[in-house]
Amino acid sequence: MEGIKYNLIGISGHKNSGKDLVANMIQYLTSSYYPKMEFLQYLKENKQSVTDSSFCIKRFADKLKDIVCILLGCTREQLEDRDFKEKELPEEWWCWKVYLDTKYYYHDYELAPFTGELDVYKQLHESPENFFGHELVKLTPRLLLQLLGTDCGRNIIHPNIWCNVTFADYKPRHFRTVKYNGIFSHQEMILPNWIIPDVRFPNEVKAIKKRGGIVIRVNRSGFEDNDIHPSEVALDNYQYFDYIINNDSDIPALLEKVKEFLYDGQDIKSNSK
């Protein structure tokens, strides 16, 4: 498709809002299968896995998911399955979340915190009376992704950890010689075309825009999401999306909105913040 001005398109939205679907639509609309093949047929035949589109899909969570697959002994295909992702892990993965002061700690499930084992935590604090309680956490693959990605990765190792490991692979495909009036001018760097459909935090938006990309928001009406983990709500009040797509109808209607964005929408709004 001609007229695409950006090499890098980020997509934000709650889970099940349609982020991946929009990413697949962008791939479809920039592939040789459009318009000769219908979009649903394109998905059914798994054509998005063929490197035919000018855009490829990358995720900030790709390498995080690889780590979780190693920990759980599962495949990426399993981890991408919605039912598998929400299924409780075996009991050996359960733990107690113990609240002390303004912090919380994870405690072995087999050592119930309301027994003498809790004294271990109390003895480590000058104010043991600040124990605020506990709750049983039955880990799921999704929760494990959140804990490793945000609570551990972003909050302990580095806030930009997943941006850094993702863009370490964002390297020029080649260089193009640019001439002016037939005379050599300079070498132009040609970067790969990426769609990143799991933008969750302001620093991820910043990382994309820093590299000349744009970020769109996908909203889905009538779909209640009670997940309040920071990875799901950190961008709820963000005001600098470059484009907003409301997924409030069926797939053909959504495809038309994505088509409008690709053809015309990139001139509607541009925020650099």
Features from the language model and the residues they span:
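Residue-level signature of catalytic and energy-coupling elements of molecular machines
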Residues: L145, I196, I245
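Short coil/turn segments at beta-strand junctions that form active-site/ligand-binding loops
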Residues: K5-N7, I190-N193, G213
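A conserved segment at the C-terminal end of the G1
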Residues: L21-Y33, L40
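Extreme N-terminus of proteins, especially the signal/transit-peptide cleavage junction
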Residues: M1-Y6, T51-D52
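Switch II (G3) loop of P-loop NTPases
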Residues: W194-F201
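Hydrophobic anchor at the beta1->P-loop junction of P-loop NTPases
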Residues: I9-I11, I196
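Small-molecule kinase domains that catalyze NTP-dependent phosphoryl transfer to phosphate-bearing small molecules
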Residues: G3, S12-S17, N24, W94, ...
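ATP-dependent small-molecule kinase phosphotransfer cores
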Residues: Q41-L191
